[in-house]
Amino acid sequence: GSGMGILLMLVSLALFVIGFTMGGLNYMITVLQARTRGMTLMRMPLTVWGIFTATVLAMLAFPALLVSAIMMTLDKVLGTSFFMPTILKAGEVLEYGGGSPILFQHLFWFFGHPEVYIVALPAFGIVSDLISVHARKNIFGYRMMVWAIVGIGALSFFVWAHHMYVSGMNPWFGFFFATTTLIIAVPTAMKVYNWILTLWRGNIRINTVMLWCLGSVSYTHLRAHETQPY
């Protein structure tokens, strides 16, 4: 892009990542070191587990976004060629050369797919706790739910290139990322069925909160807005 707007966007993006990293460190240290007496990790609310795992993901994923913003800024300001291949402009060969737009895609999606779970995992934790409260039952399989959250977070770093099947990526890499994409469905399904088993024979209060939670369960299971009944 041309003009000052792109440069300001890249600088603001870098500042955002730095600020988020500082806030994420604060949250991680609070969870690990400042819990109340008797509150072990395996007694924490699932909401806290979701936010904590999302924070760890952000601490690992956002630096890739920061690096890509810095590299793009250097391409724009100093004439480097991290992302610019040899191209023609008005019939003349640019000074830039040797870069790869695919590199930008990898850096972006290495951030971009864990970012999906940075958004989703806290919501999963909130839904888990609300279903438990409004079904008046302890959450079914608490430890399983914790490990499902952690497993989803870990696997989220091995599926990013499923956004890049048509980018010219090696087919064997595509096979690997397709396989990991299928595997990540396992802990997600564990969470959904644990929600259903928590609802089973529970003393359910049909109020606004529970209706939203039931909508979340059905949406996570059906994965389609068109089939969302709530």
Range-by-range predicted roles:
Residues 1-3, 21-50, 68-102, 106, ...:
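Membrane-interfacial helix termini and the short, flexible loops that connect transmembrane helices
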Residues 1-22, 58, 66:
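Active-site cavity-forming subdomains of large catalytic enzyme subunits
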Residues 1-11, 101-115, 177, 181:
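Short aromatic-rich membrane-water interface segments that cap or initiate transmembrane helices
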Residues 12, 16, 50, 54-57, ...:
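Hydrophobic alpha-helical transmembrane segments of polytopic
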Residues 53-69, 219:
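Hydrophobic alpha-helical membrane-insertion segments
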Residues 116-124, 189:
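Hydrophobic alpha-helical transmembrane segments
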Residues 151, 157-162, 172-191:
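Acidic, glycine-rich loop-and-beta core segments that form the ion-binding/anion-interacting portion
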Residues 220-229:
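Conserved small/polar residues in nucleotide/adenosyl-binding loops
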